[in-house]
């Protein structure tokens, strides 16, 4: 089982914590990580694209000229696709791009993401993370104490409003509860700052 240092909010080492091998100690599967990121990004797409077809474009109800005798090509509507201002053929329509990978694949992906942070020594485990009031200054101080000067994902055992409000204005820092941890967020941040209680919660679900 991988062992990592346990820190307090002042950046002091207060002990060690053993991480579950099945969650934090597997060989990261890069292909599964790729698939999980593509899935998440697909579900973030708006999908509100739309063009009008010849039935939806305004006008064009009258035949522009008679069928025969003009010497020109026959036309039925000025809103046919070949006309300027005409309808689009097979244009985009609103749709959802979201899809789901199998549950086993999704679980393997988040385990791979967490294990990659341990392998790269980019995980910081805190004994606890609590603030008496929302103070960005205090959160910056805690991150400085922990030598976290890059993009960081902070994971708490449950949604902590004071922590969330204190971190939301810090560029590159995001706070999520343990049940909201996901592959894209873990990979998109350089450091993973996680509380001991959150580690236990994640292990309980994924182990």
Swiss-Prot record:
The keyword Manganese does not apply. GO terms for cellular component: ribonucleoprotein complex; ribosome. Residues 44-78 are annotated as: Disordered. GO terms for molecular function: rRNA binding; structural constituent of ribosome. GO terms for biological process: response to antibiotic; translation. Keywords: Antibiotic resistance, Ribonucleoprotein, Ribosomal protein, RNA-binding, rRNA-binding. It holds the Pfam family Ribosomal_L4. It comes from the Bacteria. The keyword tRNA-binding does not apply. Erythromycin, niddamycin, oleandomycin and spiramycin-resistant strains have changes in this protein as seen by gel electrophoresis; the nature of these changes has not been determined. One of the primary rRNA binding proteins, this protein initially binds near the 5'-end of the 23S rRNA. It is important during the early stages of 50S assembly. It makes multiple contacts with different domains of the 23S rRNA in the assembled 50S subunit and ribosome. This protein when expressed in E.coli represses the endogenous S10 operon; this may not occur in B.stearothermophilus however. Part of the 50S ribosomal subunit. Belongs to the universal ribosomal protein uL4 family. This is Large ribosomal subunit protein uL4.
């Amino acid at each position: 089982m991988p062992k990592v240092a346990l820190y307090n909010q002042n950046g002091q080492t207060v002990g060690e914590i053993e991480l579950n091998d099945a969650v934090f100690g597997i060989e990261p599967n890069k292909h599964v990580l790729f698939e999980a990121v593509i899935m998440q990004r697909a579900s973030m797409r708006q999908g509100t694209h739309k063009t009008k077809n010849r039935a939806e474009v305004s006008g064009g109800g009258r035949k522009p000229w008679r069928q025969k005798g003009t010497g020109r090509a026959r036309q039925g509507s000025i809103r046919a696709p070949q006309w300027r201002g005409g309808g689009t053929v097979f244009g985009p329509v609103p749709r959802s791009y979201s899809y789901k990978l199998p549950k086993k694949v999704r679980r393997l992906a988040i385990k791979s993401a967490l294990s990659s942070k341990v392998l790269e020594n980019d995980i910081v485990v805190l004994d606890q993370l609590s603030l008496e009031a929302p103070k960005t200054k205090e959160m910056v101080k805690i991150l400085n104490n922990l030598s976290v000067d890059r993009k960081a994902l902070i994971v708490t055992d449950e949604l902590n409003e004071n922590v969330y409000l204190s971190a939301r204005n810090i560029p590159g820092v995001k706070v999520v509860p343990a049940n909201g941890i996901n592959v894209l967020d873990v990979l998109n941040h350089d450091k993973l700052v996680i509380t001991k209680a959150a580690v236990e919660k994640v292990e309980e679900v994924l182990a």
